[in-house]
Regions:
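Short consensus segments that form the blades of beta-propeller domains
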Residues: 2-5
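Solvent-exposed strand-loop boundary residues in beta-sheet-rich modules
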Residues: 19-21
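A short beta-strand micro-motif
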Residues: 11-16
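Acidic, low-complexity intrinsically disordered segments
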Residues: 42-88
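Short, flexible N-terminal segments of the mature chain
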Residues: 23-47
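Short coil-to-beta strand junction motifs in C2/discoidin
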Residues: 7-9
Length: 88
């Protein structure tokens, strides 16, 4: 996996319809949460230390993520994921 500098990566919170639709409903950037905080929160495998993969949001992560987004996170209404995208 190619290592990218932090200014080349944007991490976002994405929410999708629950089954059966699974369509993307919305997203918000997570640029106010430092990578170190996301790593501590999601505990990625050693193969993905910079969180370039997609992570499903579980109840224990909601409180910290909610501090960074305007959308009200509702795990009963949507499926949530933290994803990383290359910028530029």
């Amino acid at each position: 996996m190619e290592l990218l500098s932090e200014d080349q990566v944007e991490r976002v919170l994405e929410w999708y319809e629950k089954d059966p639709g699974e369509a993307l409903v919305g997203d918000e950037p997570l640029d106010t949460i430092p990578l170190a905080d996301l790593v501590a929160l999601f505990r990625p495998d050693a193969e993905d230390p910079e969180m370039h993969l997609v992570y499903e949001v579980e109840p224990r992560e909601v409180e910290r993520l909610q501090q960074a987004v305007q959308h009200r996170i509702d795990l009963d209404a949507h499926d949530y994921f933290v994803a990383a995208y290359r910028t530029g």
